[in-house]
Amino acid sequence: MTEEKADYEGVISRYYGDESVKCIIQLKVETKDADVVAEKVAQLPEIEDLFLVTGDADLIAKAGFENYNALKKFIVERLSKIDGVRDTKTLMVVTTFKERGKVRSEEQKT
């Protein structure tokens, strides 16, 4: 791991600590295997929602984790090892303003 990457990991770990983490994961997959990959990803309990989409990514997943380290372990040890997954990009949720059609109050925002 490069020094820059280690610094980034440290900042993220300190920011999120042991708090639960929600994220959006963009997956690039082998086009011919998109349905098979989607079925495998959908079986992972951490994945809350999964969509086949157009654009730069092929699949978009919403996922939840106990903490940042659990997210990191999931990406490295499980998701990236699924046959047909070419690349992933993880977007960590900082604040949730609206979820499942409901606007969150100030106290509910995460």
Language model features with spans:
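A compositional/biophysical signature of low hydrophobicity enriched in polar/charged and small residues
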Residues: 1-110
